[in-house]
Curated annotation (Swiss-Prot):
It is found in: Secreted. Expressed by the venom duct. Disulfide bonds join 52-64, 56-73, 63-77. The modification Phenylalanine amide is found at residue 78. It comes from Conus lividus (Livid cone). GO terms for cellular component: extracellular region. InterPro entries: Conotoxin. Belongs to the conotoxin O3 superfamily. Residues 21-46 form a propeptide. Keywords: Amidation, Disulfide bond, Knottin, Neurotoxin, Secreted, Signal, Toxin. Transmembrane segments: none annotated. GO terms for molecular function: ion channel inhibitor activity; toxin activity. This is Conotoxin LiCr173.
């Protein structure tokens, strides 16, 4: 009986360890996805000032921010 009890306890411990390890992987993946979404938002949501907007509107383009202090104008802004 004691051998059987030891085997049952060992199996329960193994099952607990495996399921907790799998849950940790899901949590880690969720956190990684959240970080990726935050990075994407920060890339696409750039702040532009009025001078850049006016400068680019004269050229029928969108202001994509500034590079070396100069406005960057393009039809579509990418990162």
């Amino acid at each position: 009986m004691s051998g059987l009890g030891t085997m049952v306890l060992t199996l329960l411990l193994l099952v607990f360890m495996v399921t907790s390890h799998q849950d940790g992987g899901k949590k880690q993946a969720t956190q990684r996805n959240a970080v990726n979404i935050r990075r994407r938002k920060s890339i696409t949501q750039r702040t532009t000032d009025e001078k850049c907007n006016e400068y680019c509107e004269e050229r029928d383009r969108n202001c994509c921010g500034k590079a070396n202090g100069e406005p960057r104008c393009a039809r579509m802004c990418f990162g």
